[in-house]
């Protein structure tokens, strides 16, 4: 079978970095280097070049999709003779722990909000929809944080369902990585944004991923465009360990940190601890629950060293 025939059999169009960068067209750079520095994660190199070559073409594509969706809504309103409610366009971002989902989400939020249309863009992470630690302890799930059974899926589905139904004000719980728990009574109100970016491990999952909790509607049913941030497993492990070491010298030194004891570890002890956490929890979750959802995404971004995207696959 020829390469051309093989490419016809995949549901994705494939682009290397230079091919994808060319699709930026004439979209202007709207972020400064200082702003980009504020958007990047603790363990990531995010350059002006990366934003220009990867994220500007992606924001251009998303702007086309969002405009098309608005035209479709207008057609329906014209047909029904109604003035429709403001229904947000939902973009989901999935991928492994430490792959850089949060940075991708923040960069897209910044870029999409600066298009000439001045759309309002909200960012919500699914961490807030984890069951509180007290519930996880009662169910013996503290070492399963991030696994499907650790989430209040009914609340998460209701959140996105209400947004798509035009409910004016919808609340989302907020998670604190400092205390490693959902903040009691710390809900955030989301008031009919034009775009919602939903970032988390579980946003591409469907019924087959929740055999323990059968229900018929899932987050993915309400998502308009989904992104999976991918990277080789050996890089993910390295990034996870490096991030842990930086937290050990930073966030973990806070006496209020749930992981304050880790700040006292030697570097060797910290590397061993992070490696165990990766293998026993995060790698397992990746293999069992996250990676199997990759091919459900509208777009797959594959990273190489230094968090640089080397390939983009776009669903036809």
Swiss-Prot record:
Alphabetical UniProt keywords = ATP-binding, Coenzyme A biosynthesis, Cytoplasm, Kinase, Nucleotide-binding, Transferase
Q: Does the keyword Cytoplasm apply?
A: yes
* Reactions the enzyme catalyzes: (R)-pantothenate + ATP = (R)-4'-phosphopantothenate + ADP + H(+)
UniProt key word Methyltransferase? no
Q: Which InterPro entries match?
A: P-loop_NTPase, PanK, PRK/URK
Q: Which residues bind ATP?
A: 95-102
Q: For this protein, what is any one GO molecular function term?
A: pantothenate kinase activity
List the GO cellular component terms: cytoplasm
Query: Where in this chain does the entry annotate a coiled-coil region?
Result: none
Q: Which GO terms describe its biological process?
A: coenzyme A biosynthetic process
Main localization is cytoplasm
Enzyme class, spelled out:
transferase
**Subcellular location field:** Cytoplasm
Q: In which pathway does it act?
A: Cofactor biosynthesis; coenzyme A biosynthesis; CoA from (R)-pantothenate: step 1/5
EC number(s) in its UniProt entry?
A: 2.7.1.33
Q: Which family does it belong to?
A: Belongs to the prokaryotic pantothenate kinase family.
Which NCBIfam families does the UniProt entry name for this protein?
panK_bact
Q: Which HAMAP family does the record cross-reference, listed alphabetically?
A: Pantothen_kinase_1 (MF_00215)
Q: What is this protein called?
A: Pantothenate kinase
Which organism is this protein's natural source? Salmonella typhimurium (strain LT2 / SGSC1412 / ATCC 700720)
Q: What is the lineage of its organism?
A: Bacteria, Pseudomonadati, Pseudomonadota, Gammaproteobacteria, Enterobacterales
Gene symbol here is coaA
């Amino acid at each position: 079978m020829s390469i051309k025939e093989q490419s016809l059999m995949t549901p994705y169009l494939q682009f290397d970095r230079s091919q994808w960068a060319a699709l930026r067209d004439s979209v202007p750079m709207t972020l400064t280097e200082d702003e980009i520095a504020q958007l990047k994660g603790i363990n990531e190199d995010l350059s002006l070049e990366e934003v220009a070559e990867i994220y500007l073409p992606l924001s251009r594509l998303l702007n086309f999709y969002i405009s098309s969706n608005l035209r479709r809504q207008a057609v329906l309103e014209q047909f029904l003779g109604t003035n429709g409610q403001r229904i947000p366009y939902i973009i989901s971002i999935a991928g492994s722990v430490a792959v850089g989902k949060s940075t991708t989400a923040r960069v897209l939020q910044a870029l999409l909000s600066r298009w000439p249309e001045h759309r309002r863009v909200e960012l919500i992470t699914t961490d807030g929809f984890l069951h509180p630690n007290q519930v996880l302890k009662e169910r013996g799930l503290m070492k399963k944080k991030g696994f499907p059974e650790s989430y209040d899926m009914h609340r998460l589905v209701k959140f996105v369902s209400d947004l798509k139904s035009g409910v004016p004000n919808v609340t989302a719980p907020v998670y604190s990585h400092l205390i490693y728990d959902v903040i009691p009574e710390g809900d955030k109100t989301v008031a009919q944004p034009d775009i919602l970016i939903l970032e988390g491990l579980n946003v591409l999952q469907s019924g087959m991923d929740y055999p323990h909790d059968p229900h018929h509607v899932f987050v993915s049913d309400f998502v308009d465009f989904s992104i999976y941030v991918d990277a080789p497993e050996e890089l993910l492990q390295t990034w996870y360990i490096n991030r842990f070491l930086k937290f050990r010298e930073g966030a973990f030194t806070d006496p209020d940190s749930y992981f304050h004891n880790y700040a006292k570890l030697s570097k060797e002890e910290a590397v061993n601890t992070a490696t165990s956490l990766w293998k026993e929890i995060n790698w397992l979750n990746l293999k069992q629950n996250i990676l199997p959802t990759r091919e459900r995404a509208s777009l797959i971004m594959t990273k190489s060293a230094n968090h640089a995207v080397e390939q983009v696959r776009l669903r036809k």
